[in-house]
Curated annotation (Swiss-Prot):
CDD domains, alphabetized: GATase1_CobQ
GO biological process, alphabetically ordered: cobalamin biosynthetic process
Active-site residues (renumbered): 331, 428
SUPFAM superfamilies according to UniProt: Class I glutamine amidotransferase-like, P-loop containing nucleoside triphosphate hydrolases
Function: Catalyzes amidations at positions B, D, E, and G on adenosylcobyrinic A,C-diamide. NH(2) groups are provided by glutamine, and one molecule of ATP is hydrogenolyzed for each amidation.
GO molecular function, one term: catalytic activity
HAMAP family per record: CobQ (MF_00028)
The encoding gene: cobQ
Protein name, per record: Cobyric acid synthase
Keywords associated with the record: Cobalamin biosynthesis, Glutamine amidotransferase
Statement: the UniProt record of this protein carries the keyword Transmembrane: no
Pathway: Cofactor biosynthesis; adenosylcobalamin biosynthesis
Length: 482
């Protein structure tokens, strides 16, 4: 039976996901069969698994780091926010409900069984299970019926290492404060801590490090400097969307929708040396000198159509198009480009019909059945293969479908306007296909690099593991697992 170790954080976006990925690669290189696990995740950035379900994108990256296929057991409970107070609840890869926050709180006790079932199945297949927590165990208001952090750790008897983010400031108060506010039995599960995202000379933090050890009685496993190549790895949280710019390069803009989903579609583009990827934030105008505007996926197509219009982006898009610019809509963005989006059954919210942007002559009707599959398609314009996945509800049809974006099993997929400058597709992950990406950028007169995307991700994972091995007591961490 496998051993297990849990990585929890002093807060969100402290680096838990990347540390688990780096440890997974490091321990896999030692010859261990490592499997990642996150009991509960909240993300609209999902990956399609080999068993036909969906999990958080971070667990898919961790699986890649461990050299295994992603599986629904790696993330048994996935919450996909649709509004500020409600989310789709996905269990073992399949949607079971849409619940408001209080409704979900009432569901959690019944979900612990599903979490433990998945955990036990992974343990039966692994030498080591690396568990990632969610948010912070310091949120004691959520401790009752918790399945994500200490509730799981104690039920499954998994030791915990806590990650603190020094880049935000206040890391001493974060870690010492957690020891102060959580239940003593929960605190006893924490065996140590790691300081993450340090910039500069780590010896300057020696006194702070010793103070944390003294105040908490937890063992320190090291100070991890800022990892410069983190931007080369897919990010799961919208917080991770980069504002890094490349002045003088060809601009591609992406709209930062309020319910943006599967934005890792952008990752291969941002790594292209000749592409200056601009995230257009709420309240900002779409720059007038971009060659392509991408409308990304959304967890709430009609809601984000209203959000898009509230920013004035509909007017900006029309101006961009009239100047000769190109537009690409992916999944929910594809639906928005059409003449209308109808939701007669209220799948995404109140039933109704919302006018689209009208840049494609298609209409979308939402339906309860969800398409969730990995696919191999062929780009219609260049005949290049595309390895991708679909994860959407709704069906789109109309005259512009006569000019498909791609062919999928011999059938048309997506739509293109009569002048070829507006394109829509349900294919996610399409830009990871190197030959297609190069052909697509070439048509926009943007030079593309030759380095394969997946090779770059693999290289970054190896570098992350090297970085962790150099700065943390990795053997000490492994010795904690039980």
């Amino acid at each position: 039976m496998a051993r297990a170790l849990m990585i929890q954080g002093a807060g969100s976006d402290v680096g838990k996901s990347l540390i688990v990925a780096g440890l997974a690669r490091a321990f896999t290189r030692r010859g261990l069969r490592v499997l990642p696990f996150k009991p509960q995740n909240m993300s609209n950035n999902a990956a399609v698994t080999v068993d036909g379900g969906e999990i958080g994108r971070a667990q898919a990256l961790q699986a890649l780091a461990a050299g295994v296929e992603p599986h629904t057991d790696m993330n048994p409970v996935l919450l996909k926010p649709e509004t500020d107070v409600g989310a789709q609840v996905v269990v073992h890869g399949k949607r079971i409900a849409t619940a408001r926050a209080r409704e979900y709180a009432a569901m959690k006790p019944s979900l612990m069984g599903a979490v433990l079932e998945s955990f036990e199945r992974l343990k039966a297949r692994a030498d080591l299970v690396l568990v990632e927590g969610a948010g912070s165990p310091a949120e004691v208001n959520l401790r009752k019926a918790d399945i994500a952090n200490m509730g799981f750790a104690r039920k499954a008897d998994v030791p915990v290492v806590l990650i603190g983010d020094i880049d935000r400031g206040g890391v001493i108060a974060q870690l010492v404060g957690i020891k102060t506010v959580i239940d003593p039995d929960d605190a006893a599960m924490i065996q140590g801590f790691v300081i993450n995202k340090f910039r500069g000379d780590p010896t300057l933090f020696d006194d702070g490090y010793k103070l944390i050890e003294a105040k908490t009685a937890w063992r320190g496993f090291g100070v991890l400097p800022w990892f410069a190549r983190a931007g080369e790895l897919p990010a799961e949280d919208a917080l991770g969307l980069s504002d890094a710019r490349k002045p003088g390069q060809c601009k591609i803009a992406c709209l930062a929708l309020s319910r943006i989903a599967n934005f890792d579609d952008l990752d291969p583009l941002k790594l292209e040396a000749a592409v200056d990827l601009v995230m257009v934030r709420p309240g900002e105008a779409i720059p007038g000198d971009v060659r392509l505007v991408i409308i990304p996926g959304s967890k709430s197509t009609r809601g984000d159509l209203a959000f898009l219009r509230a920013q004035g982006w509909d007017i900006d898009l029309l101006a961009h198009y009239r100047r000769g610019g190109h537009v690409l809509g992916l999944c929910g963005g594809y639906q928005m480009l059409g003449r209308s989006v109808a939701d007669p059954d209220g799948i995404e919210g109140p039933a109704g019909d919302t006018p689209g942007l009208g840049l494609l002559d298609v209409q979308t009707v939402m339906s309860p059945q969800k398409t969730l599959t990995r696919v191999t398609a062929v780009h219609a314009a260049t005949n290049q293969p595309i390895q991708a996945y679909e994860i959407h509800i709704g069906r789109t049809d109309g005259p512009d479908r006569a000019r498909p974006f791609a062919k999928l099993n011999g059938e048309p997929e997506g739509a293109i306007s009569s002048d070829g400058r507006v394109q829509g597709s349900y294919l996610h992950g399409l830009f990871t296909s190197d030959d297609f990406r190069k052909a697509f950028l070439t048509k926009l007169d943007i030079p593309a690099g030759d380095e394969p995307y997946h090779s770059r991700v693999e290289s970054a994972l190896d570098a992350l593991a090297d970085h962790i091995e150099k700065h943390l007591d990795v053997e000490g961490l492994l010795s904690l697992a039980r």
